[in-house]
């Protein structure tokens, strides 16, 4: 419930800022968030009780300095990461649902990851070319060809890199 309320608050805030300055990005806007809220208070629904207390010109100088703690002080973990990303104008799950053309050897399907390897599932192509999902580890610097539909995949690291479990590969020999 909180996530829905805060998410709708952020979308309303972003829409108000964009509407107030159509040629400038949120980060480039120099007016405080409280200015937009005061000018557009009618655009905010009655159920948005979090915004008037948290977004004010006293606590915020620019939208770029807004922190999750100002919007929802109890957010932690993945929820906090999602809210931080939304405040920055990006969606955290953009890398979780890759879309694109069928991957070939010359132009493989690119799958984004925060780490050097990731589990990926291949459902095949469209329509008659679909098959049961084939799950596999996709690793940085290595192409993978689906054994059923021959689609090619490659990993693009967009985060810190390293192993997803936080341990180096050299630790594997100690767990046998």
Curated annotation (Swiss-Prot):
A Pfam match is: COX5B
Look up the domain of life of the source: Eukaryota
Annotated region (Disordered), positions in chain: 157-176
Arranged from A to Z, the UniProt key words for this protein are: Membrane, Metal-binding, Mitochondrion, Mitochondrion inner membrane, Transit peptide, Zinc
What is the first-listed, main subcellular location in coarse terms?
mitochondrion
User: What are the GO cellular component annotations?
Assistant: chloroplast thylakoid membrane; cytosol; mitochondrial inner membrane; mitochondrion; respiratory chain complex IV
* Example of a GO biological process term: mitochondrial electron transport, cytochrome c to oxygen
State the compartments where it is located: Mitochondrion inner membrane
Q: Which GO terms describe its molecular function?
A: cobalt ion binding; metal ion binding; zinc ion binding
Lipid biosynthesis found in the keyword field: no
Spell out the family assignment given in the record's similarity comment: Belongs to the cytochrome c oxidase subunit 5B (TC 3.D.4.11) family.
Q: What does this protein do?
A: This protein is one of the nuclear-coded polypeptide chains of cytochrome c oxidase, the terminal oxidase in mitochondrial electron transport.
- Name under which the protein is recorded: Cytochrome c oxidase subunit 5b-1, mitochondrial
Q: Which organism is it from?
A: Arabidopsis thaliana (Mouse-ear cress)
């Amino acid at each position: 419930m909180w996530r829905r309320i805060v998410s709708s608050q952020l979308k309303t805030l972003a829409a108000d800022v964009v509407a107030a300055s159509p040629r400038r990005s949120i980060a480039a806007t120099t007016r405080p968030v409280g200015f937009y809220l005061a000018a557009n208070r009618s655009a905010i629904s009655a159920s948005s009780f979090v915004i008037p207390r948290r977004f004010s010109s006293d606590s915020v100088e620019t939208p770029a300095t807004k922190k999750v703690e100002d919007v929802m002080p109890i957010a932690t973990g993945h929820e906090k990461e999602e809210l931080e990303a939304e405040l920055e104008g990006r969606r955290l799950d953009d890398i979780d649902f890759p879309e694109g053309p069928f991957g070939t050897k010359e132009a493989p399907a690119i799958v984004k990851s925060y780490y050097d390897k990731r589990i990926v599932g291949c459902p095949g192509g469209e329509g008659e070319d679909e098959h049961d999902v084939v799950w596999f580890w996709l690793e940085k610097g290595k192409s993978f060809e689906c054994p059923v539909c021959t689609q090619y995949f490659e990993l693009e690291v967009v985060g810190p890199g390293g192993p997803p479990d936080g341990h180096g590969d050299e630790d594997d020999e100690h767990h046998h």
